């Protein structure tokens, strides 16, 4: 397996090194994105043109827009390569994000679940590695649940529950059914930033939520 984790850093997100033809790019590893998205300038560097097909896509804020599509010849990640990948194309301004420290969002591409789900991945926070290899199963043989993104089963208060893993989010989000299960719920104003739009909202939150994963808290 080849480590393709990028050295780029932004808000504890994961970034990978991508090779498209003779062009190198940095992509956000985003299991919450149904399709891979690239910036208009990256499409230009690839000397590719958008297609006539337009698809509707939403971001973290629920904003839905119509985006052009394009087919890029290949996406290479480490030693694996996906041919003829259809992607969404968005304006460069949609990637113009910065954090509280003034660091600039380093990616010009969102690597979506349409590509990620085709391969086998191994992540180690300790070793700072995200490795990829060919999968024993094709994307067509994934269960209906997994086709929407990876699922884990953490434990809270002695009970397991299903949670979807979205590596494009910087925080965990709970459904409304948790209101009656959690103590000390507070509210704060926060900015929800996503590709294409951001907004300030007053949201409930808990400072500490103890979950167990495979007998580890």
Labelled PLM ranges:
Residues 1-217:
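Pepsin/retropepsin-fold aspartyl endopeptidases
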């Amino acid at each position: 397996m080849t480590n393709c984790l990028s050295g780029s850093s932004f808000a504890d997100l994961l970034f990978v090194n991508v090779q498209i033809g003779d062009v190198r790019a940095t992509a956000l590893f985003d299991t919450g994105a149904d399709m891979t998205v690239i910036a208009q300038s990256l499409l230009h560097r690839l000397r590719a043109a958008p297609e006539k097909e337009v698809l509707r896509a939403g971001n973290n804020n629920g904003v839905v827009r119509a985006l052009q599509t394009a087919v890029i010849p290949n996406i290479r990640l480490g030693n694996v390569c996906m041919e003829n990948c259809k992607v969404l194309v968005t304006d460069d301004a949609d990637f113009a994000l910065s954090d509280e420290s003034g660091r600039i969002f380093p990616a010009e591409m969102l690597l979506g679940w349409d590509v990620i789900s085709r391969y086998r991945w191994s992540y180690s926070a300790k070793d700072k590695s995200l490795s990829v290899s060919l999968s024993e199963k094709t994307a067509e043989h994934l269960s209906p649940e997994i086709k929407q993104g990876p699922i884990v089963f953490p434990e809270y208060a002695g009970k397991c529950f299903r949670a979807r893993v979205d590596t494009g989010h910087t925080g965990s989000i709970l459904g409304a059914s948790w209101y009656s299960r959690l103590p000390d719920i507070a509210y704060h104003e926060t900015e929800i930033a996503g590709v294409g739009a951001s907004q300030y909202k007053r949201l409930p939150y808990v400072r500490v939520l103890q979950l167990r994963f495979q007998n580890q808290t």
